[in-house]
Design a protein with these regions (language model features):
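A short C-terminal helix-loop "cap" of Rossmann-like NAD(P)-dependent dehydrogenase/epimerase domains
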Residues: 175-178, 231-240
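Intrinsic disorder
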Residues: 60, 84, 244, 283-286
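C-terminal helical subdomain
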Residues: 90, 190, 214, 237-278, ...
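C-terminal tail/cap regions
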Residues: 1-15, 20, 232-233, 262-312
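Rossmann-fold NAD(P)H-dependent dehydrogenase/reductase core
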Residues: 3-228, 302-311
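Generic recognition of well-ordered alpha-helical segments
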Residues: 200, 253-256, 295
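Polar helix-capping/helix-linker motif
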Residues: 86, 174, 260, 282-285
């Protein structure tokens, strides 16, 4: 289990918090984009980056949600609406930044949805895959021209890419999710896509000083146990405290990958507990990553025209 793993070579590990990661880091004059910034790991990420002096561009599904972040951010905070399941929303968001001439030092692709019990689609694409991967794929590619020379892109993946993904990896003929939809496997596929996107992006950035890395934040403690009966809840809470992280710990790895000087120039890696970690065999499959990039471009082009995707 991650919790019982040794502290990594850099002295950081399971219990390390985002504040501890950044204790000696001054982010003044840095501009960092965070998606899914209004709750959970995203909110803690904004708080700590703001604490260290960064200008944070906090993206959320609605402008009301983005504005709700202001009380925990510094005066430089910029709220933006960005619904990652809606191409027109992504375009409006990126055009706002392009027109403002904003230079971006880091993008943290944090937003995500998980294990929808029933199949949900938008533009003919299963919603977890659309939101978690395609939306971020479109956002990052539209912002590339704004990145500084040493910009870092951090994609929040998950160990679910190993645990829950389909046996054959990405189901290139089933982005609709129609074929035997499984909530966990669909989520695992989206997290594998995050990892493959990061790796292929790193390959494409090779030769520059810009980097791309993926991270596993850990399993985060939530209020999902509130409906348990008292006896079961007591036992579940004990297990939760042993195996789950709080948000302060959960945000540490994505902030580490996005800001820490020790990994300046490091690219194409997968981090967990603020240390490099191995992936599944599919996570290292470069051909699958290239194929996913090609399909992602096709899907993005199709849905940007308001047309539904049809499985091929």
């Amino acid at each position: 289990m991650d919790r019982f793993a040794k502290i990594g070579p850099n002295g950081l590990g399971f219990h390390t918090t985002a504040e501890e990661v950044t204790r000696s880091i001054d982010l003044t004059d840095k501009t960092i984009v965070v998606t899914g910034a209004n709750s959970g790991l995203g909110l803690e990420t904004v708080r700590v980056l703001s604490l260290r002096g960064a200008k944070v561009i906090g993206m959320a599904r609605t402008i009301e949600k983005a504005n709700s972040i202001k009380p925990i951010a510094n005066a430089l905070f910029m709220p933006l609406e960005c619904d990652l399941s809606e191409p027109s929303s992504i375009m409006r968001c990126t055009q706002t930044l392009i027109k403002s001439g904003t230079q971006i030092d880091s993008i943290i692709c944090n937003a995500g949805i998980m294990a929808l019990p029933q199949l949900q689609q938008k533009y003919g694409v299963e919603l977890q895959f659309l939101t978690n991967h395609i939306g971020h794929f479109m956002l990052v590619n539209q912002l590339m021209a704004l990145l500084t020379d040493e910009a870092r892109i951090t994609i929040v993946s998950s160990s679910a890419h190993k645990v829950f993904a389909y046996p054959d990896g990405i189901q290139f003929d089933n982005f609709s999710g129609f074929n035997k939809y499984n909530p966990q496997k669909a989520y695992g596929q989206s997290k594998l896509a995050n990892l493959l996107f990061s790796n292929e992006l790193a390959n494409r950035l090779n030769g520059s000083h810009q980097t791309a890395n993926a991270v596993h934040p850990g399993v985060i403690r939530t209020n999902l146990l509130r409906h348990y009966n008292p006896i079961l809840k007591y036992g579940a809470v004990l297990v939760e405290k042993l195996l789950f992280k709080n948000v302060h710990q959960g945000a540490a790895t994505q902030i580490y990958a996005s800001t820490h000087p020790d990994i300046k120039g490091v690219s194409g890696k997968y981090f967990s507990n603020c240390n490099p970690k191995s992936t599944s065999r599919h996570g290292e499959d470069q051909m699958m990553g290239k194929k996913l990039w090609e399909f992602s471009e096709k899907i993005a082009k199709t849905i940007s025209q308001g047309t539904d995707w049809e499985d091929q």
